[in-house]
Amino acid sequence: MWLFRSGEDGLPPIVLYHYTETRARYNAVDFLDGFSDGYLETDGYQGYNNLPGIRRCSCWAHTRRYFIDVVPKGKQYDYSNPAVQGVQFCSKLFEYERRSQNKKHTFEQRKAYRLEKEKPILDEFWSWLDEQKPRKGSRFET
């Protein structure tokens, strides 16, 4: 089962469920045929990679989960651990998203709020990420 949902643009969302017998990449390619020059926010499924005319965006909840999965279990948080730092970046973004939702921002207000509050966090995150050396075989290895 595939789920496609429109973005949060101030209009009522469009939600489409599409059943296929497999989750093969060609199903996404066929369904999204004609959708171009747009953004597609996805989970980590590799079948979405390199879809023609589409810029893929990662889901922050999934990104955060990848960091959480490698945080050492059963210990107090070690804030020098890169996985813990990655979780903290994501948590800051989620906190600002919650605040924006609680303030019931319009689409334009949310965009301005994100540029003011979240963009500096994202800029810092990307710089931090460039300095990291992911372990061989990890989801973050390029």
Residue ranges of predicted features:
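Catalytic center-proximal scaffold of phosphoryl-transfer enzymes
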Residues: 1-142
